[in-house]
Amino acid sequence: TDTFEPGSTMKPFIAALSLETGRVRPDSPIVSSPGSMVVTGFPIRDSHPYGTLTVEQVIQKSSNIGTVRMAMNLQPREMWDMFSQIGMGQKPQLDFPGAVTGRLRPYKTWRPIEQATMSYGYGLSASLFQLARAYSVFARDGELVPVSVVRRDAPPAGIRVFTPETASAVRHMLQMAAGPGGTAPLAQTPGYTVGGKTGTAHKQEGRGYAGNKYRSWFVGLAPVSNPRIVVAVMVDEPSTGVYYGGAVAAPVFSQVVGQTLRLLNVPPDADVKSQIVAKVPAVEESF
């Protein structure tokens, strides 16, 4: 399969690592004013000036600045180790044609601006499969398990990436991102709680990025109360006139999740009426 820069879908992993290492709590304040910052001469911006956000709100609103501030308090080796553990830059151990490695450069070569941009998904690449597997760590209480294309009688042993407490905290952030006030209310699925993260990335063109070509992402899990599935959606060069992941990929996620959970006979865990949010405008994500 092809690989792509995953954009803002990487932000929850920076929040998780920051929680795991004790740098922050879910309610820790992070200053994003005035909506822009400079890292070694390179500007980084949010789509809106959010002021002070909690860590939870950084993920809910998809703040580049909030994510970068967390990332720059981490050591490059810590980020690299975590990215490697969730499968970035690693060839999937999967007997399936086309499984690809993606790109994650050695941490010793990272410049500060590269550490910053990798925190929101630029400067590394992954396949859609790798992203879905990475998000399974939040669905499985912080454990990453081997993937198989055939059903197994017993769940395989995995590796511990985050504590169950960290995974639970991030699941709540993902639920906030997929709700009113988040970047993807259109991901909501009647009858089920869902959580996930949008991503929108400029496409690479030559040695830089195309100004008007995008990839739109949404990666999430459901039900949040007891995750059964992880779904990753990527739309290449959306042609509807809108390109944010919350507007393009999230509705596809919603349809797939609803149909799949019903096929699996998963009982609803949410009130249908309380989830009708189609008229609630999504927050435009920063990317």
Predicted regions and their residues:
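Beta-lactam-recognizing serine transpeptidase/beta-lactamase-like catalytic domain environment
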Residues: T1-S8, F13-S239, G245, V277-F287
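Short, charged, low-complexity patches
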Residues: L131, G245-G258
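Short amphipathic alpha-helical signal-transduction/dimerization elements
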Residues: A139, A178, S254-L261, N265
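Short beta-strands and strand-coil junctions in structured, solvent-facing domains, enriched
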Residues: S239-G241, R262-L263
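Gram-negative outer-membrane assembly/targeting C-terminal domains
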Residues: L261-F287
